[in-house]
Design a protein with these regions (language model features):
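Conserved donor NDP-sugar-binding/catalytic core segment of glycosyltransferases
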Residues: 91-120
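Short, well-formed alpha-helical segments that are part of the catalytic scaffolds
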Residues: 11-26
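Short aromatic/hydrophobic "clamp" motif used to bind/position activated sugar donors
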Residues: 80
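Glycine-rich, basic loop-to-helix element that forms the pyrophosphate-binding segment
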Residues: 59-75
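Acidic helix N-cap motif at the loop->helix transition within catalytic regions
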Residues: 14-18, 43-52, 92
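Acidic donor-binding loop at a coil-to-helix junction in glycosyltransferase catalytic cores
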Residues: 163-169
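Short beta-strand/loop segment that forms part of the nucleotide-sugar
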Residues: 7, 20-21, 31-40, 57
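A conserved acidic beta->alpha catalytic loop
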Residues: 38-46, 87
Length: 230
């Protein structure tokens, strides 16, 4: 099974290298490719990706769903794995991902752990959100996987949504087979908690679990706002 890791990126020179290296180490037992969809970065994002051997797709969307789609278009693997540019993947995560597909799932995800200093509100609410996402069988964004066939049948990521596009795709993927939330967890940056209030972030995560909520489109700044190193 060939794995295609797709990383949407915008001005991710600080953390992208760590993400790519974690994938390379974690997927070494499999045939794999790493695709970085660079959404008009004005830093060294593309250069770092190329230096580390990743395939770089240049785009100018300012829309994470379309950027993920652009990366998927050039993928040649038997499994599409979408990883955020600030997320570290382990061997256990990759192994459980492959096992999920081998056991009949067509899609799935991993609920992330946040690194660094995280506000108390986030620490309190995150376990509840993890249960909600598992019960609803939707991806939390930092790590999601699906077969190319189910991805196309579901219509790819919906460009109407500037955020939470993975939740809406997850709901559509349910029509085409089993969805599996793996037990292993990726580690993602807690930097958003340092540029946005924990209440804003937690409410965004809660809203995306509610069918029909589209106000999430207005929260583009949460994904394309100022970057902090860590």
């Amino acid at each position: 099974m060939k794995l295609s890791f797709i990383i949407p990126a915008w001005n991710e020179e600080t953390l992208l290298g760590l993400t790519i290296k974690s994938i390379q180490q974690s997927a070494e037992d499999f045939e794999f490719e790493i695709i970085v969809a660079d959404d008009a970065s004005d830093d060294r994002t593309s250069e770092i990706a190329k230096e580390l051997g990743a395939i770089v797709v240049s785009c100018n969307n300012r829309q994470i769903g379309l950027t993920r789609n652009d990366g998927a278009v050039v993928a040649t693997g038997d499994l599409l794995i979408f990883v955020d540019a600030d997320t570290v993947v382990s061997k256990t995560v990759v192994r459980e991902t492959v096992e999920a597909i081998e056991n009949g799932a067509v899609a799935g995800g991993s609920f992330p752990m946040f690194e660094g200093n995280v506000p108390l509100l986030a620490k309190v609410i995150t376990p509840t959100l993890r249960i909600m996402f598992r019960l609803l069988r939707v991806a939390a964004g930092a790590y999601m996987f699906c077969t190319p066939e189910s991805f196309e049948k579901a219509g790819r990521f919906d460009p109407k949504f500037f955020a939470a596009e993975e939740v809406h795709l997850s709901n559509k993927l349910h029509k085409f087979g089993k969805y599996k939330t793996i037990n292993a967890r990726v580690v993602t940056s807690g930097r958003k908690f340092r540029t946005h209030s924990s209440f804003e972030i937690m409410m965004t995560l809660v809203l995306v679990t509610i069918p029909g909520i589209r106000s999430i489109k207005k929260r583009k700044n949460l994904w394309y706002g100022p970057r902090t190193p860590q």
